[in-house]
């Protein structure tokens, strides 16, 4: 049935690529990327987000409206480390033969990830590169270059906005460093290990409850409880799309607090500050 639907979509939208020369559509994999494209382009392009608000890369299925936008897109800006990107690449290029595909994370040193039972990760690397300002500067530069290539007539405006964005990112990095500087307890408890790049930049240690994409074993939970009590860790982060049962159980054991974060939120800057504020409460 899925193959039939895909073929039907392919037939319906393949002809759309003929008008792509006048298109101002840019496709991105996840919502935070839209934030950065918007920061660089203003209202000069339309952004098609493949994983829409409230959805997850874990169970991604393309919508007909997204296929239509992809058929008109000049470029697809990938994160480059998400499994669905590889899974759908051939199908997307079948619909739009001229689609330029750009790995926005090119130049980032990837962090090895665990085996993910939900298949979010492509290969063996952690995909959450957008959750650290240092990596975002690389992503922003790759995004700028791709946008200038696709829309050279707007290069001047893009450069002005890009430089303004870099200033915001540098300012945010400084704020985070300042808030975390007094911190002696530099451990982060998190259900799904999404903060590895953040931890690398700001010299923190990420401790995941999840193991290889699976629920924590009783032994692992006991080890985490012992560690949290010993080091006075009281904050447990969990992404909003995950079941909070184990995190809540752990919080009761250590007298802690479960904090829900949304790595896929559009407002990237606010997410970074909210995460930092909570980490900074752990003296």
Task: Walk through the language-model features, giving the residues of each.
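Short, intrinsically disordered low-complexity segments
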Residues: 1-2, 17
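Sec-dependent signal peptide recognition
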Residues: 2-8
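Extracytoplasmic metal-acquisition and chelation regions
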Residues: 16-283
């Amino acid at each position: 049935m899925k193959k039939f639907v895909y073929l039907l979509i392919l037939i319906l939208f393949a002809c759309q690529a003929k008008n792509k020369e006048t298109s101002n559509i840019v496709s991105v994999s996840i919502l935070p990327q839209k934030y950065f494209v918007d920061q660089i382009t203003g209202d000069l392009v339309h952004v098609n987000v493949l994983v829409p608000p409230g959805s997850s890369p874990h169970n991604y299925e393309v919508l007909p409206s997204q296929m239509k936008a992809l058929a008109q897109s000049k470029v697809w800006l990938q994160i480059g480390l998400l499994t669905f990107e590889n899974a759908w690449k051939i199908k997307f290029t079948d619909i739009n033969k001229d689609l330029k595909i750009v790995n926005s994370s090119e130049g980032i040193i990837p962090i090895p990830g665990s085996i993910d039972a939900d298949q979010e990760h492509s290969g063996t690397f952690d995909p959450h590169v957008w959750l650290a300002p240092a990596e975002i500067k690389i992503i922003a530069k790759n995004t700028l270059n791709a946008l200038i290539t696709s829309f050279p007539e707007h290069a001047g405006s893009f450069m002005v906005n890009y430089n303004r964005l870099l200033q915001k990112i540098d300012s945010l990095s400084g704020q985070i460093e300042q808030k975390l500087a007094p911190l002696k307890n530099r451990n982060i408890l998190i259900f799904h290990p999404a903060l590895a790049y953040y931890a690398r930049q700001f010299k923190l240690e990420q401790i995941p409850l999840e193991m290889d994409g699976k629920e924590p074993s009783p032994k692992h939970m006991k080890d985490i409880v012992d560690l949290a009590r010993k080091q006075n860790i009281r904050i447990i982060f969990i992404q909003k799309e995950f079941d909070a049962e184990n995190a809540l159980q752990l919080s009761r054991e250590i007298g802690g607090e479960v904090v829900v974060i949304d790595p896929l939120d559009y407002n990237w800057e606010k997410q970074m500050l909210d995460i930092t504020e909570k980490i900074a409460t752990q003296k």
